[in-house]
Regions:
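Polysaccharide-binding and catalytic clefts of secreted carbohydrate-active enzymes
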Residues: 54-387
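A hydrophobic, multi-pass inner-membrane permease signature
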Residues: 2-115, 360-664
Length: 664
């Protein structure tokens, strides 16, 4: 029967009360949903948009934010790399604006040419505490290639890795030298050639010249450069690294310092005719020919006269070192014999051939890198938005799945915890409810008192106990206690029960604490790195025993009397009668046991030092220390899914607890 009748519900006051109640409930729902939306939104962000708070990611609807995230991802989250390639300052990713329309002809020619450019590095392959698409795909390709055997990968690719989570793509070559010719580098380059051309970062020596020399020397204000050189450039984008050294003295000095000391040697070439100076350099660098041969076993010679002058970057690292040191020698290596040949020069030749005009008529051309990046972004908006939305979740799932035993360990741990909790706690509560010993409330008080101490207080004592667990004394003492109870109940029936229990307990303590250690010599065993170490500390729960005891007390005693008349055993009464009528409270117990086992990470980390026994929560805890804030949010969302599913499964059973007393 409703509290308010249908007639009463027609009045304005009652409707106003109803409306107020629903409004308050709606506010409560919003207050819960909005923080959830903030966390879900934060789980699909990166460094670019992590500062934007809102219930949805802005790059879903704003092309500007999408372009910022695309540039961040492509340039491996290194602002310096993007600035050097773009040839202009960026500052932060959030300051990037949509580029203005430039020369469409140059852009189309650049897009047609860039697949032929030999100077590039794969973008979206690495990042600071984030794993972009190509980095994740590279790891997956190697995982499939070696069937998940990290040792085989380390051996065949000559790249030692202890675990798959430590495997990352090699970083872009820094400073002057390229990567050495190693199997792991070759594997990455082979993978890079399978990725889309739009993911390639085209090297830009002009941008390097601005970023690594002009700005440190003349600040980022181009007017300072203009005053020093007598020029009228509007920006550093108009300052190019010429193929040959300029005539103007200060520009020539800038060119010399940058090319000799900073520019990667892959862009530097020497004119023929420096054989004698180069041989003199080697004779001064190496005391004897034998010393040279020892350092250059791949190119042993009888005398320095047999050494050829390198015209470009050599292949071996020792030859590259000689090449760099020779470049720095201003006496033996004149500036007139050095020239630069890089992507811009090749692009200019491509444009000249395509337009059938002399190269001199179009040089210098500023490569439209920014416009090309924007074109690539706008041409793949749907795929990019999906990738940015899912990549953090893919990163977390890859991290979990690459630790093959993490899921298995968690599943075993949760099953053991729930199963044993559904066995131990109901048995204890049934004994207190069914037999009602005089010490019932003392036992309940002792169980409830354990809740006064936080779990962190017992971590160290539990660790010490599990490290030196008295397994054999417990078995011996328990067996002695059981035998003593049976013997005393058989031969001393007239003795009070409390006295018999006390005597049996004393016998068990004597056997367990003294006799067994004396006989075995080593009574302790270590339970660390076992499932027993995870399950035993939470095997019995005082609060659940108290809760179950109260629920069992509500079961009518007439049911047990009827079972006694039918000749039911105590186990039958417990299992078929008590447990079958207690499914709602058992669902609460199972949900609590699962939540406690699934979410445990600190205790699991303490008692399980072996990584092979770690659970998912321990791995996610480790992931959060090395990952971006958005990845942490994604890991929390994924970690909450199993608990949510278990709660949904148990919810219907728990709700039956409202009507079960009526049924009984």
């Amino acid at each position: 029967m409703p509290v308010i009748s249908r007639i009463g519900a027609r009045s304005f006051k009652v409707r106003f009360v109803y409306g107020t109640i629903f409004f308050v409930l709606a506010l409560g729902a919003v207050s819960m949903i909005y923080p959830l939306l903030l966390m879900l939104c934060g789980s699909v962000k990166s460094e670019t948009d992590i500062a934007y708070l809102g219930p949805y990611p802005r790059y879903w609807f704003e092309d500007k934010v999408l372009f910022q995230k695309y540039v961040e991802s492509k340039y491996n989250m290194q602002i310096q790399e993007a600035e050097a390639d773009w040839g202009r300052p960026i500052g932060t990713w959030r300051r990037i604006e949509l580029p203005a329309e430039g020369d469409a002809a140059y852009l189309e020619e650049f897009l047609a040419w860039r697949s032929e450019c030999p100077w590039w590095w794969l973008g979206s392959s690495s990042g600071m505490r984030l794993v972009p698409t190509n980095g994740r795909q590279f790891r997956r390709s190697l995982y499939r290639r070696f069937d998940g055997d990290i040792q085989a990968l380390s051996t065949q690719l000559d790249s030692p890795h202890r675990a798959w989570r430590h495997l990352h793509p090699p970083p872009k070559p820094g400073y002057r030298y390229p990567h050495p010719d190693r199997p792991f580098i070759r594997a990455f380059l082979d993978f890079a050639h399978t990725r889309p051309v739009r993911d390639r970062i085209i090297e830009n020596p002009d941008g390097l010249f601005w970023h690594r020399h002009l700005v440190p020397t003349y600040t980022d204000d181009v007017q300072v450069y203009n005053e020093a050189h007598g020029t009228k450039h509007a920006s550093y984008g108009e300052v190019f690294l010429t193929p040959r050294a300029p005539v103007e003295p200060l520009q020539r000095e800038d060119w010399s310092q940058f090319v000799r000391d900073v520019l990667p040697i892959t862009f530097i070439h020497l004119d023929p005719g420096l054989e004698e100076p180069f041989r003199a350099f080697l004779a001064d660098r190496y005391p004897t020919v034998e010393a040279y041969n020892q350092a250059h076993p791949h190119n042993a010679v009888d005398s320095f006269d047999d050494v050829d002058q390198p015209l470009a970057m050599p292949q071996h690292r020792i030859d590259q070192t000689d090449f760099v040191e020779f470049l720095r020698d201003q006496t033996l290596c004149p500036l007139e014999n050095i020239h630069v040949h890089g992507p811009r020069q090749v692009f200019e030749q491509f444009v000249a051939q395509r337009r059938r005009v002399p190269v001199e008529s179009i040089t210098p051309i500023r490569m439209p890198v920014i416009a090309a990046d924007f074109r690539d972004c706008m041409a793949n908006t749907r795929a990019l938005r999906w990738d940015f939305t899912t990549r953090n979740y893919k990163h977390v799932l890859d991290y979990i799945l690459l630790h093959g035993r993490g899921i298995v360990n968690t599943l075993i741990y949760c099953v053991l915890s729930v199963g044993l909790a559904l066995l131990v706690n109901p048995v204890a509560a049934y004994a207190l409810s069914r037999y009602k010993p005089p010490s019932t409330y003392t036992v309940l008080l002792f169980c409830i008192a354990t809740m006064a101490f936080p779990g962190e207080v017992t971590m160290i004592p539990s660790f010490l106990l599990l490290k030196r667990f008295p397994l054999w004394p417990l078995i011996g003492g328990g067996a002695a206690f059981g035998v003593a109870v049976w013997l005393l109940s058989k031969f001393m029936r007239d003795t009070p029960e409390l006295l018999r229990i006390t005597m049996a307990l004393g016998m068990g303590i004597l056997v367990g604490a003294w006799a067994v250690p004396q006989l075995t010599g080593r009574p302790y065993v270590s339970l660390l790195n076992t499932f027993a170490a995870l399950v035993l500390p939470g095997l019995a729960n005082g609060y659940m025993i108290f809760l179950l005891k109260g629920f069992f007390d509500s079961i009518p005693r007439q049911l047990y009397e009827a079972a006694d008349i039918d000749g039911a055993s105590e186990w039958t009464k417990f299992w078929s009668l008590t447990m079958s009528l207690s499914t709602p409270i058992l669902a609460v117990l199972a949900l609590g046991a699962f939540t406690g086992a699934y979410s445990a990470f600190m205790m699991a980390l303490i008692v399980i030092p072996d990584e092979d026994m770690w659970t998912i929560m321990v791995w996610l805890f480790q992931l959060q220390h090395i990952s971006h804030q958005s990845v942490v949010y994604a890991s929390l969302v994924i970690a909450a899914i199993p608990t949510f599913l278990v709660f949904v499964f148990c919810q219907g059973i728990i709700m039956k607890g409202i009507v079960v007393p009526v049924d009984k």
